[in-house]
From Swiss-Prot:
<dbReference type="GO" id="GO:0008237">
    <property type="term" value="F:metallopeptidase activity"/>
</dbReference>
<feature type="binding site">
    <location>
        <position position="182"/>
    </location>
    <ligand>
        <name>Zn(2+)</name>
    </ligand>
</feature>
<dbReference type="InterPro" id="IPR001405">
    <property type="entry name" value="UPF0758"/>
</dbReference>
<keyword id="KW-0482">Metalloprotease</keyword>
<keyword id="KW-0862">Zinc</keyword>
<dbReference type="InterPro" id="IPR037518">
    <property type="entry name" value="MPN"/>
</dbReference>
<feature type="domain" description="MPN">
    <location>
        <begin position="110"/>
        <end position="231"/>
    </location>
</feature>
<feature type="binding site">
    <location>
        <position position="193"/>
    </location>
    <ligand>
        <name>Zn(2+)</name>
    </ligand>
</feature>
<keyword id="KW-0378">Hydrolase</keyword>
<keyword id="KW-0645">Protease</keyword>
<dbReference type="GO" id="GO:0006508">
    <property type="term" value="P:proteolysis"/>
</dbReference>
<keyword id="KW-0479">Metal-binding</keyword>
<feature type="short sequence motif" description="JAMM motif">
    <location>
        <begin position="180"/>
        <end position="193"/>
    </location>
</feature>
<dbReference type="InterPro" id="IPR020891">
    <property type="entry name" value="UPF0758_CS"/>
</dbReference>
<protein>
    <recommendedName>
        <fullName>UPF0758 protein aq_1610</fullName>
    </recommendedName>
</protein>
<feature type="binding site">
    <location>
        <position position="180"/>
    </location>
    <ligand>
        <name>Zn(2+)</name>
    </ligand>
</feature>
<dbReference type="Pfam" id="PF20582">
    <property type="entry name" value="UPF0758_N"/>
</dbReference>
Length: 231
């Protein structure tokens, strides 16, 4: 039998027990974020702990809960975590919400006017055929989601209001912007465009949604029903 060795301890260390150069901030600066554990990354965001718990112990406790559980918890419930005060509970909720918005690749951009809608939409259409796109916005005019609702031939695109409203209900959207392109010709509304917009507006009102605008795009230009006073 060899000489007895000191017991190796894999338990989680408190921040003050870690050499300064290996603490989360210093480690991030020297080695990059990919070399930090989840607890260390959260510790960098939280910045400091409290009298009851240092930042690494606090981060470990939060990570152990899991992201889905943190998403469900209210600020009041988070305050029950030992060492987590109001400011840090709000930081955690803000971080979880930000992560949720970026998840899936569709960041929550804001679309507050026809120009911003045009900038978002201008590269979403197939120039060879007419398509109808719907944007779904929340109360703060942030984009919840968007989809191609219908595809037609060179000159026409057909859809029914229910094709647009089904997803609005699913997303609990507040406002809807629709847009279609004119592959050939001016970005001005036809009688069919006007009639469809009126039908959709009435359907939106019945279900408590707001039809914010209808844009027609063609050759780098756009026509906004809202801007022109048609809607």
């Amino acid at each position: 039998m060899g000489q007895a060795r000191d017991r190796v301890n894999y338990s989680f260390k408190r921040l003050k027990e870690i050499p300064e150069e290996l603490r989360p901030r210093e480690k991030l600066l020297k080695l990059g974020p990919e070399n930090l554990s989840d607890e260390e990354l959260l510790a960098v965001i939280l910045g400091s702990g409290s009298k009851g718990a240092d930042v690494l112990s606090l981060s470990k406790e939060l990570i152990k809960m899991g992201w889905e559980e943190l998403e469900k918890k209210s600020v009041e419930e988070l305050l029950k975590v030992r060492g987590l005060g109001l400011v840090k509970a709000l930081q955690v909720k803000a971080l979880v919400e930000l992560s949720k918005r970026f998840k899936g690749g569709k960041s929550r951009i804001s679309i507050r006017n026809p120009q911003e809608a045009f900038e978002f939409l201008k590269d979403k259409f197939d120039e060879r055929r007419e398509s109808l796109i719907a944007l779904y916005l929340d109360l703060s005019n942030r984009l919840l989601d968007w989809e191609v609702v219908a595809i037609g031939n060179v000159n026409t695109v057909f859809s029914k209001p229910k094709d647009i409203l089904f997803k609005a209900v699913k997303l609990s959207a507040n406002g809807i912007i629709i847009a279609h392109n004119h592959p050939q010709g001016e970005p001005s509304p036809s009688n069919e465009d006007l009639n469809f917009t009126e039908r959709l507006k009435k359907a939106c009102e019945l279900l408590g949604f707001e039809l914010l605008d209808h844009l027609i795009l063609s050759e780098g230009r756009y026509f906004s029903f809202r801007e022109e006073g048609v809607l």
